[in-house]
Amino acid sequence: MGEYTISKALNNNVIICTYNNQEVILIGKGIGFNKKAGMTLDESASIEKVYKLEQKQQQEYYKSLVEIADEDVLQAIIESVNFITSTTHTTDDKNLVVALTDHIIFAYKRLKQNQIISNPFAIETKHLYSDAYAIASQVIDKLNQRLDVKFPPDEIGFIALHIASNTEDLTIHEMSLINKLISKSILIIENDLNHEIDNHTVQYQRFIRHIQFLIRRLNKKEYIYAQDVFIDMVKNHYPNAYNTAFKISKMIQKHLNIPIDDSEIVYLALHIYHFENQISSSHN
């Protein structure tokens, strides 16, 4: 049976150890109580999590977070990570634990100082990552109860992005960019149609999904192609929708620095035409 040699106890629940000549982080309730450097733990100790953070910078940052964190907050974070991984059936959560520790520690600090940050992309996140959003909602409920606080609803969207990044083939940066481009696309449509888009409709959900997969295709250099006759038909029959789609394509192109083909623009135009129809129907 292997042994962990303690390098440092960060607090009662987190210790830094060496195991097989590698530095690891052990997490467990009370695992660091009265522990000192040089002591050993065997694998039968009450260890909840073992993290081997490959990047030295990531290791040092996590240590610095744990050292400034209130122990109740840290335990609530550990419970949140355990809940997320068991609910999503994921095992590789070392990036999630660092990201959530970072986010929740500072969100809690802001809350105590009455500094509330709004989430401009909460609606997009809820629609695009509905499963992660539902789990995040439960996480916030548990944190509120555990820490006797009331996090604002916008925090659900922030936590959802961290959960989704651990279960989907996307980074937080990529998801945030997708949300930003969707929001800008909707603004372009609303300006051109002079009408607010209802974000509760099936059409809205289909459109933002289309934008999401468009951006993912472009980043992976995967392209779709439409026949010239179809492209001409859309341009001629739905000129306003095509014009709006063209504006959106130019905006996305500017952000991604990737050219967008006419085939992609006409499929965008069809979605926009459905919005036009929806608005016309509501006026009749």
Swiss-Prot record:
This protein's record includes keyword Iron: no
InterPro entries: BglG_antiterminators, CAT_RNA-bd_dom, CAT_RNA-bd_dom_sf, PRD, PRD_sf, Transcrpt_antitermin_CS
Gene3D superfamilies reported in the protein's UniProt record: 1.20.58.1950, 1.20.890.100, CAT RNA-binding domain (2.30.24.10), PRD domain (1.10.1790.10)
Residue stretches in coiled coil: none
Keywords, sorted A to Z: Repeat
Domain PRD intervals: 65-173, 174-282
SUPFAM superfamilies, sorted: PTS-regulatory domain, PRD, SacY-like RNA-binding domain
Listed SMART domains: CAT_RBD (SM01061)
Entry's Gene Ontology BP terms: positive regulation of DNA-templated transcription
MF annotations from Gene Ontology: RNA binding
Family: Belongs to the transcriptional antiterminator BglG family. GlcT subfamily.
The name this protein goes by in its record: Protein GlcT
Name of the gene: glcT
